[in-house]
Amino acid sequence: MKVKVQTLDAKASGDIELNDEVFAVEPRADILARVVQWQLHNRRAPARAARERSDVARTGKKFGRQKGGGTARHGDRRAPVFIGGGKAHGPRARVFESSLNKKVRALGLKMALSSKAKDGKLVVVDTLELKDAKTKALIAKIGKLGFGATALVIDGEAVDNGFQLASSNIHTINVLPAIGANVYDILKHETLVLTRAAVEKLEARFNG
């Protein structure tokens, strides 16, 4: 698959040949859903347990007499009705992490990249280097390139520092190095922007 490459000034900068095994895989909703769910499960922090009645370190002695005291028929001070007592039906400790086969994860990433290419939402730029690392200047360039409502920009080994600084105040743009490319973030944004270096890194990731 051949795609046109642009500069940040929206000028033509030649073409790039994309590997069909990475950027032309037929997307499957079930695979993409499994990978996204796996990502979100692993992002979730473990649930902490609350101390229930049996977990509270308080006396087990009966609170007052059963009859004749003029009060409720309480058992011990660990009951949920007392301050310092246990929690009634409290949350238990739970870890939400799940596992997913490496091949399925790799296939999901290929499908996410391919879905953007198929929908015409893939933009390839030559480099992210900015002469003037200012937010105002970057917004003007983005308008010419047509990034859409939201864009995920992926660079090579590391994101260009000037571009990262200039884009940090633009809430519709997120940037990642190639190693951080993932299905959830790609699908979450309307447009996927790759540099030449990012394309090389992503293709090497699957071929290596």
From Swiss-Prot:
The keyword Transmembrane helix does not apply. SUPFAM superfamilies: Ribosomal protein L4 (SSF52166). Keywords: Ribonucleoprotein, Ribosomal protein, RNA-binding, rRNA-binding. The keyword Cytoplasm does not apply. InterPro entries: Ribosomal_uL4, Ribosomal_uL4-like, Ribosomal_uL4_dom_sf. One of its GO terms (cellular component) is ribosome. One of its GO terms (molecular function) is structural constituent of ribosome. Residues 47-84 are annotated as: Disordered. Residues 49-58 have a biased composition (Basic and acidic residues). GO terms for biological process: translation. HAMAP family: Ribosomal_uL4_B (MF_01328_B). NCBIfam families: rplD_bact. One of the primary rRNA binding proteins, this protein initially binds near the 5'-end of the 23S rRNA. It is important during the early stages of 50S assembly. It makes multiple contacts with different domains of the 23S rRNA in the assembled 50S subunit and ribosome. Forms part of the polypeptide exit tunnel. Part of the 50S ribosomal subunit. Belongs to the universal ribosomal protein uL4 family. This is Large ribosomal subunit protein uL4. It comes from Rhizorhabdus wittichii (strain DSM 6014 / CCUG 31198 / JCM 15750 / NBRC 105917 / EY 4224 / RW1) (Sphingomonas wittichii). The gene is rplD.
